[in-house]
A protein has these predicted regions:
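Periplasmic-binding protein-like
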Residues: 90, 94, 98-133, 155-165, ...
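Ligand-binding clefts/hinges and TM-proximal coupling segments of bilobed small-molecule sensing domains
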Residues: 48-63, 106, 135-175
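Extracytoplasmic small-molecule ligand-binding "clamshell" domains
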Residues: 64-68, 89, 130, 170-171, ...
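Short, hydrophobic alpha-helical packing/hinge segments within bilobed ligand-binding/sensory domains
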Residues: 73-77, 83, 92-93, 210-211, ...
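C-terminal motif of bacterial Sec signal peptides marking the signal peptidase cleavage site
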Residues: 17-21
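Acidic, polar ligand-binding/catalytic clefts
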Residues: 25-35, 100-112, 122, 208, ...
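Bilobed "Venus flytrap"/periplasmic-binding protein-like clamshell domains
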Residues: 26-71, 90-94, 125, 186-191, ...
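Extended ligand-binding regions for polar small-molecule ligands
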Residues: 23, 47, 117-159, 208-217
Length: 273
């Protein structure tokens, strides 16, 4: 996500709001990040949207950040009128906007995509190569598109990867996996990527189905470790799971600290009011 363009727009908006305030006017209408000056914005902690808001504050923008562990809490805030907008990933916004047009509206979308990848511990390059091949296989055989259509209503993965030859899976690269289990770290409060069904007992979502497909191809049982997103990377560092499949945005900082796959889905930041 190219935050500099957004930040420049916000700073310009802050100056405009200042001029308006001096003339006696005031507005809380949010149409873009340029309107964040003086606004209350709900966001999930440790996400790129949260990072972007914090950067705005550091640059002097007077935006009140309302951070929550789960994105569901952000939309609860918005529905109850406790915030002016939610700053969130487009894949999540689409879930809340479907059939809820009377409650929520998407008013702005970032121009540039924000790719998401699977995250592994630094140095686990063999497993990284295997996971890349497996994702390619899901694109090659059309399964990735099926999973996307199931959870988003359309194939939002179209064009993310182009695979014209059937990949080869080298299962000898599973040497770091123990006890025949593929352990996945994720945060089950991010629909439609990963969340629980109405009973609260079963994990469902795009990333959940993706993990199960990987387990099937690898001949492994899949086990999920549900944790908060702001602590998910610490769990990977401690070896609590083999990888993170949790709508992880690919950033230079994460690529330096971890092994990140190429994108398996692309995303954008949006503002929902």
């Amino acid at each position: 996500m190219k935050a500099k363009k957004i930040l420049a727009a916000v700073l310009a908006g802050a100056l405009a709001l200042c001029a308006t305030a001096c003339s006696g006017g005031e507005t809380k209408k949010i149409e873009s990040p340029a309107d964040f000056e003086g606004a209350k914005i709900s966001v999930q902690t440790a996400t790129t949207a949260h990072d972007s808001l914090q950067e705005m504050q550091e640059q002097g923008v007077n935006v009140e950040i309302l951070p929550y562990e789960k994105v569901t809490q952000c939309f609860d805030d918005l529905e109850l009128g406790r915030c002016d907008a939610v700053y969130v990933d487009s894949v999540v916004a689409a879930y809340y906007l479907t059939g809820e047009e009377d409650k929520f509206q998407s008013v702005w979308r970032s121009e540039e995509g924000e790719p998401m990848g699977i995250c592994l511990k630094k140095g686990n390059t063999g497993m990284l190569e295997l996971v890349e091949s497996a994702i390619d296989m899901l694109y090659y055989n059309g399964k990735m598109g099926e999973i996307a259509t199931k959870h988003f209503g359309s194939d939002v993965t179209e064009g993310v990867r182009t695979v014209t030859e059937e990949p080869t899976l080298d299962l000898s690269k599973l040497s770091t996996v123990e006890d025949g289990k593929l352990i996945i770290g994720f945060e089950a409060g991010y629909p439609p990527m990963e969340y629980t069904d109405d009973s609260g007992l079963e994990f469902i979502g795009f990333d959940v189905d993706l993990a199960k497909e990987l387990g099937s191809m690898f001949g492994l049982e899949v086990e999920f470790v549900n944790t908060t997103f702001d602590g998910i990377f610490a769990g990977l560092d401690k070896g609590q799971y083999d990888m993170i499949i949790a709508a992880v945005s690919i950033t230079p900082e994460r690529q330096e600290a971890y092994e990140m796959t190429e994108p398996y889905i692309s995303n954008q930041l949006v503002i929902v009011t």
